[in-house]
A protein has these predicted regions:
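Ankyrin repeat structural motif
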Residues: 35-43, 69-78, 103-112, 133-142, ...
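Sec-dependent signal peptide recognition
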Residues: 2-10
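Ankyrin repeat A-helix N-terminal signature
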Residues: 29-34, 62-69, 97-103, 127-133, ...
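Start-of-repeat signature of ankyrin repeats
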Residues: 23, 56-57, 91, 121, ...
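Ankyrin-repeat inter-repeat connecting loop/turn
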Residues: 49, 83-84, 114-117, 147, ...
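Intrinsically disordered, low-complexity regulatory segments in ankyrin-centric signaling systems
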Residues: 20-47, 55-58, 74, 78, ...
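Ankyrin-repeat boundary/linker signal
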Residues: 52-53, 87, 117-120, 150, ...
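Ankyrin-repeat-protein effector appendages
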Residues: 20-29, 143, 176, 185-188, ...
């Protein structure tokens, strides 16, 4: 008899889990496919814009941004229930994802909603540097992004631009005042990182910038 009770309880639990998973699966799929109509329907039924994909740990907004689902992303960002600073398992926020995917519209919308531009560790500016988007990097700097923000391994946005071969962003950051003399946890400068990644031309640009700086004199 006790076995039958346990089986019945397990069956009820599985049915409950399946029922909960249905709408979650649907909203994740809507985010992936940019199904604006389905998203509106699900949100109208009370499903949260902060729903997390149980498979990836990403929010549906992050999924929409990653997949280029502009309509769904815009609707989620406009939802006043949206929690702007939700993080994926790797620490990414929606603003970071938007910067990496070069989604200028989403970056502007998220900042207008109050998204944090500079966080401890990895920042949206690192991601804009990695993707090579000078427009988004400029927007972030205009909204007071810390230009020398350091990742957990002490990589600055300039170092990321150098490593990824993004010369335009590297030059933008240098013009904006990035400190080219900083070193990461391997004791490498941005120039050395560029050379190691076989981007000697970017390394040369950084070296020329350093050479033109005023010499620091001890008091």
């Amino acid at each position: 008899m006790s076995n039958m009770i346990r089986i019945a309880a397990l069956s009820a639990l599985l049915l409950s889990s399946t029922a909960c998973a249905g709408p979650v699966h649907d909203i994740v799929l809507a985010a992936q496919m940019d199904n604006f109509t389905q998203l509106k329907k699900l949100l109208g039924k009370g499903l949260s814009p902060n729903t997390i994909d149980p498979v990836t740990g990403e929010t549906v907004l992050m999924i929409a941004l990653r997949e280029g689902s502009q309509g769904v992303a815009a609707e989620l960002i406009a939802d006043q229930r949206l929690e702007l600073e939700q993080q994926a398992p790797n620490g990414n926020t929606a603003l970071m994802m938007a910067a990496f995917k070069r989604n200028k519209v989403a970056v502007l919308a998220l900042i207008a909603r109050g998204a944090v531009v500079t966080r401890p560790g990895w920042t949206a500016l690192h991601y804009a540097a990695a993707s090579g988007d000078t427009d988004i990097a400029t927007i972030l700097l205009e909204h007071h992004a810390y230009i020398d923000a350091a990742s957990p391994s002490q990589l600055t946005p300039l170092m990321i631009a150098a490593r990824e071969g993004q010369r335009d962003v590297a030059e933008l950051l240098l013009r904006a005042g990035a400190d080219a003399r900083l070193r990461n946890n391997e004791n490498l400068t941005a120039s050395q990182i560029a050379v190691r990644a076989n981007y000697e031309a970017i390394g040369a640009v950084i070296d020329r910038h350093i050479a033109a700086l005023p010499i620091k004199r001890s008091p």
